[in-house]
Design a protein with these regions (language model features):
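Catalytic Walker B motif of ABC-type/P-loop ATPase nucleotide-binding domains
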Residues: 151-155
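Conserved ABC ATPase "signature" region
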Residues: 97, 101, 107-122
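The feature captures the beta-strand-to-loop junction immediately N-terminal to the Walker
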Residues: 35-37
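Helix-to-loop junction immediately C-terminal to a conserved catalytic motif
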Residues: 50
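Conserved ABC transporter NBD signature motif
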Residues: 58-69, 73
Length: 244
């Protein structure tokens, strides 16, 4: 059953096109990884899916309801941006409790999530003293505080210590009951996590493959190169075939 529908979505920045006519669907419980070079449009697309930026064209729906203009639909989304965007003067627990109150969630859930991300013993410490990896884990816990149906995570593995890498990867792999979209440059971890791989190039969705079709992360790179060659050969007027 289709949970997330992205139809003809584009984002223009003056004369520059950041995302160009992207369409795809995602089922509940399915994990998609956005793969592409720097500047491919991954973060721009995630920001529109998170309702942090409005599409210039196109429509995004969740369970059939339009995302734009609906606070109730937006509340079904959890977001972890590349920047942690935490209140550094507050403790990890206080950051989570603040977010819980904003969503009308019982604050007792905060300690459970701190344990989930491996920070149960650090909840009373100010975030200002945390490493980047620890802050990223707090951000993930915050994004899950209201039990969202869709989790969006921009570059979950970048610049993290090994403990944080393992913990975040483990949490993401455990989220089997909700839709997840991850943008990452970590091909090996992204490949292990994905049900689907969405290939972006110059703002366009040039391919969509099932991870089960790809024998390894190296095969993922080969498939991306193949899609890019098809796109170049067909020019701006054509779209390569989409593998289901």
């Amino acid at each position: 059953m289709v949970f997330l529908s992205v139809s003809g979505v584009s984002k223009h920045f003056g004369a520059h096109i950041g995302v160009d006519d992207v369409s795809f669907e995602l089922e509940a419980g399915e994990t998609a990884v956005l793969f592409g070079a720097n500047g491919a449009g991954k973060t721009t697309l995630l920001r529109m899916l998170a309702s942090l930026s409005r599409p210039t064209e196109g429509e995004i729906t969740i369970a059939g309801d339009p995302l734009i203009g609906s606070a109730a639909v937006r509340a079904r989304i959890g977001v972890v941006t590349h920047e942690t965007m935490l209140y550094e003067e507050l403790t990890a627990r206080e950051n989570l409790r603040l977010h819980a109150r904003l969503h009308g969630v019982d604050t007792t859930r905060c300690d459970d999530l701190l344990e989930t991300v491996g920070l149960a013993d650090r909840g009373g410490e100010r975030v200002a003293g945390f490493s980047h990896g620890m802050s990223k884990r707090v951000s993930l816990a915050r994004a899950l505080i209201h039990d969202p149906d869709l989790l969006l995570f921009d570059e979950p593995y970048t610049g993290l210590d090994q403990a944080s890498l393992q913990r975040i990867a483990g949490v993401l792999e455990s989220l089997e009951d909700r839709a997840v979209i991850v943008s990452t440059h970590d091909l090996e971890r992204g490949y292990r996590l994905a049900d689907r791989v969405l290939f972006l190039r110059n703002g366009r969705l040039v391919g969509d493959s099932r991870a089960s079709e790809l024998a390894s992360s190296e095969a993922l790179i080969e498939r991306y190169d193949e899609y890019c060659r098809e796109t170049v050969s067909m020019g701006r007027q054509g779209h390569p075939g989409v593998s289901q």
